[in-house]
Structures are given as structure tokens and as C-alpha cells.
Regions:
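Bacterial Sec-dependent N-terminal signal peptides
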Residues: 1-25
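A cross-taxa feature marking solvent-exposed loop/turn segments within ectodomains of secreted
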Residues: 16, 96, 107-109, 143, ...
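Mid-length scaffold segments of soluble, non-membrane domains
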Residues: 73-122
Length: 179
């Protein structure tokens, strides 16, 4: 019980810290064209929380057009996508300690590089030196998703897939509990 309470307190503190960081960086109270969204998922006793902007297709060519292949993308709109882990996890088999990170990607035609970056920022100041982890995953063709969405699927008490889905591309990323 004590371990659960400690993890919960760390998670809540991390959320407040990350929200305070974003609040300090925002310089306007205007409504964004791409609305902000968040998703939270529990895997076992581990909480995973993301905040991101949801851009729309709006009849544009997305991957290979608006979002070029082979270039770092902040994985959303408005600001960098933030991801918080209440406990250590494995992303595609690689250890990521509990904490708050930025999620960047490098889209490709058939595979994407998933980047876990130590620095929380607006998203335009990406610093490769702050990368904690880079893994490669396969992208899949899927049904059309007008607004970008990040969600979880195939969740068990040990693992699940974080999915980045926009236009007709979906990118599943395996996340499992660390021992």
C-alpha cells in the first residue's frame, strides 16, 4: 500500500510540474486551431499520461507533405507532446525510467523513429543531445482519422500499445512494465 501511495504522489507531483512548465511557456490565451488533448492509461499499477495538440488533415497531404519524411516532428501541434510515466517502463524493449519526457518522432514511409527526449519545450527547440531513447517501429495503413489522436490499445496488466493515428497512418508503440 505504501508503494502505491508513493507512486501516486510522485505521479501527481510530476503532473503538476509538467503543467507548470507548459503554463510558463504559453504566451497567449487564444484558442488553438488544433485543440489540446490528453490521454491517461494504467498498465498494471503504472500510470502513463500524455498531453498533445490534435491537428486536422483539412484536405492536406500529411505524411510526406505537411509532415516531411525523415525529419523530426513534435508529434502533434502547438507544443511538444509530453509523456509521463509513474514507474519505469520498457518501450519496444528499452528501459525508460519513471519521469516526464517529450515525445518526438521521425516519420518514414514504412517505419518511424520514436524519440523519448529529456527536455520539455515548446517543440520547436528540439535538441538531439537531450534524447534519452530512440527506437524504430513499423507504421501501418489504417482508416482515415481526420484529427490526430494518440490512444492505447491491447492493454493488459503487463503491457499495451500506445498508438499515434492521423490521416491513414497508425503507429503502434509497445510499452510494457519494467521488472
Amino acid at each position: 500500500m505504501k508503494a502505491i501511495l508513493t507512486s501516486l504522489l510522485i505521479f501527481i507531483a510530476t503532473l503538476f510540474i509538467s503543467q507548470a512548465t507548459f503554463a510558463q511557456e504559453r504566451t497567449t490565451d487564444r484558442v488553438w486551431a488544433s485543440p489540446n488533448a490528453s490521454v491517461a492509461q494504467t498498465i498494471g499499477l503504472t500510470e502513463i499520461y500524455l498531453t498533445y495538440g490534435r491537428p486536422s488533415v483539412n484536405e492536406r497531404e500529411i505524411f510526406g507533405g505537411l509532415v516531411p519524411f525523415g525529419e523530426v516532428w513534435r508529434t502533434g501541434a502547438n507544443e511538444a507532446t509530453a509523456i509521463v510515466f509513474s514507474d519505469d517502463v520498457l518501450i519496444e524493449g528499452e528501459l525508460v525510467p519513471e519521469g516526464t519526457y517529450s515525445l518526438y518522432t521521425i516519420p518514414g514511409q514504412n517505419e518511424w523513429t520514436i524519440i523519448i527526449n529529456n527536455k520539455l519545450s515548446w517543440g520547436t527547440q528540439y535538441d538531439e543531445a537531450e534524447d534519452f531513447l530512440r527506437v524504430t517501429v513499423q507504421s501501418k495503413e489504417s482508416f482515415h482519422m481526420e484529427q490526430m489522436m494518440i490512444y492505447f490499445e491491447n492493454v493488459t496488466d503487463q503491457d499495451g500499445h500506445l498508438v499515434i493515428h492521423w490521416d491513414t497512418t497508425r503507429v503502434p508503440v509497445h510499452i510494457q512494465l519494467a521488472d
